Amino acid sequence: MKFELTDLLTIAKRDNNTLRPYLFVNPLQGKHIPADPKVSLQLFRLLAQKVEQRYQGERLLAIGFAETATAIGAAVAWYAENVAYYMTTTREDIAGAEYLHFTESHSHATDQRLIANGLEDCLETIDRIVFAEDEVTTGSTIEKCINELRRRFPASAKRFGIASLVNSMSDQRLSYFSEQDISCDYLYHIDRETMSWGFDENQWVEPHKSVKGAVEIVPTRMTYGNGWDERFVTPKAQFKDKIDTLMKVAIPDLALTAAQRKILVLGTEEFMFPAMFLGMRIEELHPDTTVRFHATSRSPIMVSEDVNYPLHTRSELESLYEKGRKTNVYNLCKYDLVIIVTDACEINEEGLQTLLHAICEHGNKNCILIRWRNDVP
């Protein structure tokens, strides 16, 4: 399948962010905008092929950046034959984790972390770390992570690479990374300076604040243990086995009917790839069914009535992971079935109520909640 730059690129405005007021929103990424999971994974596979071709003969650790690029990193690990290990960065507090800290200065949540547990042993067996992103603007956040890795593991002189769907680094920054022997691979390069916004900034609408309390939807709850957390460095074989196991147990339990022709699979915050993969498998097994996937997000983005703008509705939620944490879900609409897939070990029930309210307010009546718990086998 061939993709054009216009397929991957729309521009939106961050809510109350003066450091970097605009961001690229990829309609095929499956984060903010509902996307066909099969098409999203085909796109990510193209990036995985670039990684595989670039680093032939090397053993790689693929790291997906939270929050938006965790599924991209997982897909690179899944499809690139030379990836031996996979993990993601995180903003979560994980029991028993030791962290490497660095910052993402332009973000709505500046603190980023990489879990150090098991990383030193992994580094002894690989040749290179490849960071996977949706879009790289300056590369400064990745550079900070590299510096922290070098500081923490000085005896491990590993090489590094960057793989992104879109790259908008200046020629100067690209040259800098080349001089540092850090390869940059991407599907498209764009010049931010020549980009036009193409939307009317006078048509902003207020986000809808979803409320707590009793809801009309009572989700069917399914809980599976996996004893695995993608935020910890994981051998690829184990990662793939965990995903395959979820597919084998969850899909029969869904008991999908012929009347459920339009389905949304919704991930939560950093947790995307297993849910996206589930959506793709549902499509494969039920070819007459239309499946869409996206995920809740911490990122606050403006919404607009302008038809040329990518985001039209925003429901403000409380997180399933933590009381008081604000999250958002964009561009909800009506489906025959909504399947929420989360790795929240202890779900914040008040947060779940806000999400169910938002789903209900867009005309949805049927919901399944899948908890893929990493704290039990």
Predicted regions and their residues:
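PRPP-associated nucleotide enzymes
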Residues: M1-P377
